[in-house]
């Protein structure tokens, strides 16, 4: 059967999500999930009917939260589908290209590869910021420029001034896609206010992280109405299951937003605990993080990762040499992780 697949698919190395990698243990800090398990009510009496393509109450609720108009919002099956929609809608296969800046989220490249779209890599600088001169030199045939802030896996914020420069240099040439999956942990750093000025800006959001709804698979794309209308041409007819829409509206209600805000504060305290605790271990470097995870450099990253795995503490290995990404869990999980790493280096 494999020989019948498209050539790009035969050669494709799939994205290794945390669940695909697997593992067994009682401390799971490998997928940037929330440790909170919130309860919701759903009405299963309407499951015989299809959902709306873009449920109005859900779109209005997220528009209110994000500070935009409903016509500037599109919901999809996670932000990953938003990535695919943008590539399908704006990139001609075997002609156009996307540009991304590693180390960063791996699905930009994989999604482009599955659609036969060229991937241009412009690595981040040594302090993990945009290399604007190199980006400008590589914009030929580029339709989409993906920027993740806070960046995954490094955790840092991309400089706002550089984002504006990027938007300026790509006007009438390409769309800048800001991946703000983790922006709810630092909302002051959002670029949503730039939508009014830059029609070539699109923003990816999700309920997976700060809203503790990774299993819901609910994402959003924010952009000007003209761009959203293009995406509506290629999205599936019924992309949002009825229970997903109902739960999303509850999560975005005043009570849901208050709970999310409290949980973000709780995770911020645990992140600080992890950062301080690991920084005290000789030879360990903890990079400043703005999401619900930290990138940590160890003297022997691969060995530490394997030792933690065997101890039932499941972390996320990183493409950056000797670096491991650690999600921020509840306090007990953070304490167990810090204690294990301290003992490992004694």
UniProtKB/Swiss-Prot annotation:
Pfam families: Aminotran_1_2 (PF00155). Its cofactor is pyridoxal 5'-phosphate. It catalyses: L-histidinol phosphate + 2-oxoglutarate = 3-(imidazol-4-yl)-2-oxopropyl phosphate + L-glutamate. InterPro entries: Aminotrans_II_pyridoxalP_BS, Aminotransferase_I/II_large, HisP_aminotrans, PyrdxlP-dep_Trfase, PyrdxlP-dep_Trfase_major, PyrdxlP-dep_Trfase_small. GO terms for molecular function: histidinol-phosphate transaminase activity; pyridoxal phosphate binding. Pathway: Amino-acid biosynthesis; L-histidine biosynthesis; L-histidine from 5-phospho-alpha-D-ribose 1-diphosphate: step 7/9. The modification N6-(pyridoxal phosphate)lysine is found at residue 209. The keyword Transferase applies. It is an enzyme of class 2 (transferase). Keywords: Amino-acid biosynthesis, Aminotransferase, Histidine biosynthesis, Pyridoxal phosphate, Transferase. One of its GO terms (biological process) is L-histidine biosynthetic process. Its EC number is 2.6.1.9. Belongs to the class-II pyridoxal-phosphate-dependent aminotransferase family. Histidinol-phosphate aminotransferase subfamily. PANTHER family: HISTIDINOL-PHOSPHATE AMINOTRANSFERASE, HISTIDINOL-PHOSPHATE AMINOTRANSFERASE-RELATED. HAMAP family: HisC_aminotrans_2 (MF_01023). Homodimer. This is Histidinol-phosphate aminotransferase. It comes from Vibrio cholerae serotype O1 (strain ATCC 39541 / Classical Ogawa 395 / O395).
């Amino acid at each position: 059967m494999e020989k019948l697949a498209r050539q790009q698919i035969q050669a494709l190395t799939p994205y290794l999500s945390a669940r695909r990698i697997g593992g067994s243990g009682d401390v799971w800090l490998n997928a940037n999930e929330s440790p909170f398990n919130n309860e919701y009510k759903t009405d299963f009496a309407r499951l015989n009917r299809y959902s709306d393509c873009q449920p109005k109450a859900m779109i209005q609720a997220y528009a209110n939260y994000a500070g935009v108009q409903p016509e500037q919002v599109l919901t999809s099956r996670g932000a990953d589908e938003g990535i695919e929609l943008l590539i399908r809608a704006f990139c001609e296969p075997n002609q156009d290209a996307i540009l991304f800046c590693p180390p960063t989220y791996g699905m930009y490249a994989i999604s482009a590869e599955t659609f036969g779209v060229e991937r241009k890599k412009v690595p981040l600088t040594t302090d993990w910021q945009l290399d604007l001169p190199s980006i400008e030199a590589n914009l030929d045939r580029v339709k989409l420029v993906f920027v993740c802030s806070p960046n995954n896996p490094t955790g840092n914020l991309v400089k706002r001034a550089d984002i504006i420069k990027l938007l300026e240099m790509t006007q009438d040439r390409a769309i800048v896609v800001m991946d703000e999956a983790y922006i709810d942990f630092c909302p002051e750093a959002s670029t949503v206010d730039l939508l009014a000025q830059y029609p070539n800006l699109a923003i990816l959001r999700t309920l997976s992280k700060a809203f503790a709804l990774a299993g819901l698979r609910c994402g959003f794309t924010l952009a000007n109405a003209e761009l959203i209308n293009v995406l509506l041409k290629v999205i599936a007819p019924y992309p949002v299951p009825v229970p997903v829409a109902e739960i999303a509206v509850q999560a975005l209600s005043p009570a849901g937003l208050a709970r999310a805000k409290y949980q973000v504060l709780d995770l911020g305290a645990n992140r600080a605990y992890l950062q301080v605790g690991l920084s005290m271990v000789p030879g360990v470097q903890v990079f400043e993080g703005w999401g619900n995870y930290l990138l940590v450099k160890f003297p022997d990253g691969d060995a530490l990762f394997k030792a933690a795995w065997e101890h039932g503490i499941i972390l996320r290995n990183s493409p950056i040499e000797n670096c491991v990404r650690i999600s921020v869990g509840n306090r007990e999980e953070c304490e167990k992780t810090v204690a294990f790493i301290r003992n490992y280096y004694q």
